[in-house]
UniProtKB/Swiss-Prot annotation:
Keywords: Cell inner membrane, Cell membrane, Membrane. Could be involved in insertion of integral membrane proteins into the membrane. This is Putative membrane protein insertion efficiency factor. The lineage of its organism: Bacteria, Bacillati, Cyanobacteriota, Cyanophyceae, Synechococcales. It is found in: Cell inner membrane. It is a peripheral membrane protein. Its main location: membrane. InterPro entries: Membr_insert_effic_factor_YidD. It comes from the Bacteria. One of its GO terms (cellular component) is plasma membrane. Belongs to the UPF0161 family. Coiled coil: none annotated.
Length: 79
């Protein structure tokens, strides 16, 4: 039961990221300061760590993506 709930939540998060990539990102243009981009990071983090830890890692990454932090390579941590 827990695995099904986690799968549903993962799919919801991934759908939100796909929506952002398809509809919002083209309007805003490239703005991410990191490699991989924040949306790529989010997909990888959720696929690698699941919806809870992956979502938390993605949220922390989004908060770091601003002009006050240095840019560059910032991969998803291993398990």
């Amino acid at each position: 039961m827990i695995k099904k709930i986690n799968a549903v939540i993962s799919n919801l998060f991934l759908t939100l990221i796909r929506f952002y990539r398809s509809w919002i990102s083209p309007l805003l243009g490239p703005s991410c300061r990191f490699v991989p981009t924040c949306s790529e990071y989010g997909v990888e983090a959720i696929e690698k760590h699941g919806p809870w830890k992956g979502g938390w890692l993605t949220l922390k990454r989004l908060l770091r993506c601003n002009p006050l932090t240095p840019c560059g390579y910032d991969p998803v941590p291993d398990k």
